[in-house]
């Protein structure tokens, strides 16, 4: 399996420096590629999934890859696709986030220092020790401010007259230096990132060529949206996280089971590692039974992230909920510890906020008015409904938002 050919076939390709030469090198020798992740949260999410699948592909093709966690650059913040200065994250938060991100990645790839296992690095290791004056003297001359001002991440902010701090302006210099450092000490010759990173990546390519004259490349992936143009991994309830403590395997399964019909085959190629034969069968199934096709892709993608046991549980729960109208213990669960509240009763809008189906009581009210809320599969029409102890069947009720999001609410024993 040739890396670039498979990269293009799956739909990962957007833009590259000297694609012909990169293809030649990757077909004839081991490349060393790096992908970076900022550590702004305690888990990666579906929006990061394409980069993770690329790391898997590199490993499967026998190439070496490096994951760089931005322990240092996260303190600054990438201005790409941002309208305002990001909140400064503390060192303690960064360390917690790094631990969570590693857990996300370990679901998909193996870390080690053997021939083609993935190497995990934190750019804090080399950036924290940089002397500012020496950095300006040794590397500042290699960067053109004129060119930096034409980068989309900078240009768009200036055109919209939104503030761009000098702190953020330095981000692209540090990312470029990351590539130079990795090339010098780890023989890294390829940086891969999203299309919004093209300017930062090409600056790194230029820096390496100017300072060491080594042959390096940049490769970007498209910004992933669904058929409606919505960014991948975002829902009304926030990001779809990869770590199970932030998004249950069942909710992860439901996210993929709820994709649009037009996205099934595309997402199967991008995220499911379906073979050509499996894709052919899935295409035929999509034509005859779209729900079954979605169930298959949801199962396969959940299997990759959460393992067979959790994927089986999620599938069985979905079957019971939507085909047999039966709730199951594998649904996300919220436990009410103080049942005295239930003797008086809990307003439905308050309950929706408490269990996370609404962010505010006002939003809960709107969901009810839009016929979006059910309790034990019965539509809630009254925004003033009070949920009481007698509503619990066997000390459990199922609260549903639409057809796909369900939470078991239990009374503590």
From Swiss-Prot:
Keyword terms: Aminoacyl-tRNA synthetase, ATP-binding, Cytoplasm, Ligase, Nucleotide-binding, Protein biosynthesis, RNA-binding
Function: Catalyzes the attachment of tyrosine to tRNA(Tyr) in a two-step reaction: tyrosine is first activated by ATP to form Tyr-AMP and then transferred to the acceptor end of tRNA(Tyr).
Gene Ontology annotations for the cellular component aspect, listed alphabetically: cytosol
One Pfam short name: tRNA-synt_1b
Ranges of residues in domain S4 RNA-binding: 346-411
Motif interval(s): 'KMSKS' region: 231-235
Gene3D superfamilies: HUPs (3.40.50.620), RNA-binding S4 domain (3.10.290.10), Tyrosyl-Transfer RNA Synthetase (1.10.240.10)
Identification of the protein by name: Tyrosine--tRNA ligase
Gene Ontology biological process terms, A to Z: tyrosyl-tRNA aminoacylation
Assembly with partners or alone: Homodimer.
Enzyme class: ligase
Amino acids binding L-tyrosine: 34, 171, 175
Family, similarity comment: Belongs to the class-I aminoacyl-tRNA synthetase family. TyrS type 1 subfamily.
């Amino acid at each position: 399996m040739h890396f670039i050919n498979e990269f293009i076939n799956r739909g990962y390709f957007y833009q590259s420096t000297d694609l012909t030469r990169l293809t030649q090198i990757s077909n004839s020798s081991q490349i060393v590629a790096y992908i970076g992740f900022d550590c702004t949260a305690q888990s990666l999410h579906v929006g990061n999934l394409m980069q993770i699948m690329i790391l898997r592909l590199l490993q499967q093709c026998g190439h070496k890859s490096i994951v760089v966690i931005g322990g240092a650059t996260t303190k600054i913040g990438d201005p790409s696709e941002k309208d305002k200065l990001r909140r400064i994250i503390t060192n303690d938060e960064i360390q917690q986030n790094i631990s969570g991100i590693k857990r996300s990645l370990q679901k998909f790839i193996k870390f080690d220092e053997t021939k083609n296992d993935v190497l995990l690095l934190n750019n804090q290791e080399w950036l924290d020790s940089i002397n500012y004056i020496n950095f300006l003297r040794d590397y500042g001359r290699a960067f053109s401010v004129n060119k930096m001002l034409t980068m989309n991440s900078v240009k768009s902010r200036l055109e919209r007259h939104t503030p761009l701090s000098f702190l953020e302006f330095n981000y692209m210099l540090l990312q470029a230096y990351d590539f130079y450092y990795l090339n010098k000490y780890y023989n890294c010759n390829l940086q891969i990132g999203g299309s919004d990173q093209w300017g930062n990546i090409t600056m790194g390519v230029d820096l390496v060529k100017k300072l060491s004259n080594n042959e390096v490349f940049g490769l970007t992936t498209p910004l992933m949206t669904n058929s409606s143009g919505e960014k991948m991994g975002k829902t009304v309830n926030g990001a779809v996280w990869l770590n199970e403590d932030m998004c249950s395997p069942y909710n992860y399964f439901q996210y993929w089971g709820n994709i649009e019909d037009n996205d099934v085959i595309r997402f199967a190629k991008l995220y499911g590692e379906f073979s050509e034969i499996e894709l052919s069968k899935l295409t035929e199934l999509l034509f005859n039974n779209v729900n079954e096709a979605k169930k298959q892709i949801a199962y396969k993608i959940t299997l990759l992230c959460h393992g067979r046991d959790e994927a089986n549980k999620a599938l069985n729960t979905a079957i019971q909920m939507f085909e047999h109208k039966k709730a199951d213990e594998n649904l996300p669960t919220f436990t009410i510890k103080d049942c005295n509240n239930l003797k008086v009763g809990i307003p439905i809008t308050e309950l929706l906020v408490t269990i996370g189906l609404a962010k505010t009581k006002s939003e809960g009210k709107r969901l009810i008015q839009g016929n979006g809320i059910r309790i034990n599969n019965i539509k809630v029409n009254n925004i003033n409904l009070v949920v009481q102890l007698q509503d619990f069947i066997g000390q459990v009720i199922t609260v549903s938002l639409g057809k796909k999001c369900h939470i078991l609410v239990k009374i503590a024993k």
